[in-house]
Amino acid sequence: MDWTGVRAMVFDMDGTLLNTEHAIVTAASQTLVQLGHAPLPAAYRMPNMFGTAADLMADVLKERQLPMPQAGKAQLGQWFEHHYAQQPPHGAPLYAGVRAWLQAARDQGLALAVCTNKQHALALKGLEAAGILDLFQVVTGRDSCGVAKPAPDPLLFTLGHLHVPPHAAVFFGDTHADAACAQAAGVRFAWFTAGFGTDLVRQYPRVLDFADYRGLPLPTVALA
């Protein structure tokens, strides 16, 4: 990867920085129980790991052949987020090497930010619990600008707050929603292949595929 001209690195959160799969499945199961349904079976795999909370839960209901509650999809997402907020911090660990690599990037003078479909308050809580919130200048949640990825708006919103143009940034993510967001925003995309994404990501342009931050070359850029 040639880091020339890169002034900012923006990261998706779930499946890119934090392995939140266990916490997400647990919160989804608790939401089903709240609705009067059976909990999810052990080792359940979420049918959707890249949308908003409401999207995730709607797809769980569909996969389990359960009806949408009368309160609607938006309320369903809020119930999920309530249960997710109760999960213990250790339920969403950092991927190996994340903190050291982020710190190295900061030491090179790069601006760092997070752009996630998680609610902003939950994103702040998760990053703080993981001990990396202090490394980011901007954290954008799905409620920060009124629209979620794969729309380009959240990423452009993030870069606007960093005062960095799209051509001078790289977006790190794990799903095709991240890749589509980057493409629409005119931002280079780096794919974390060990996250929650599928081969759908291969349909989008990428400057880097990597599975481990510990093997990722450290940025050594000279900023103009």
Residue ranges of predicted features:
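Asp-based, Mg2+/Mn2+-dependent phosphohydrolase catalytic module
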Residues: M1-M9, Q103-R106, Q119-H120, L124-A224
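N-terminal helical cap/lid subdomain that shapes the substrate entry/recognition surface
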Residues: D2-A100, R106-Q108, A121
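Conserved SAM-binding loop
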Residues: L17, M46, L112-C115, V147, ...
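A generic structural signal for short
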Residues: L17, P89-H90, A111-L112, D143, ...
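Conserved catalytic-core motifs of eukaryotic protein kinase domains, centered on the activation segment
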Residues: H22, T116, K125
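Residue-level detector of anion-binding/catalytic polar loops
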Residues: A38, A111, R188
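Hydrophobic, well-structured mid-protein blocks that either form specific transmembrane helices
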Residues: P93-V98, A111-T116, I132
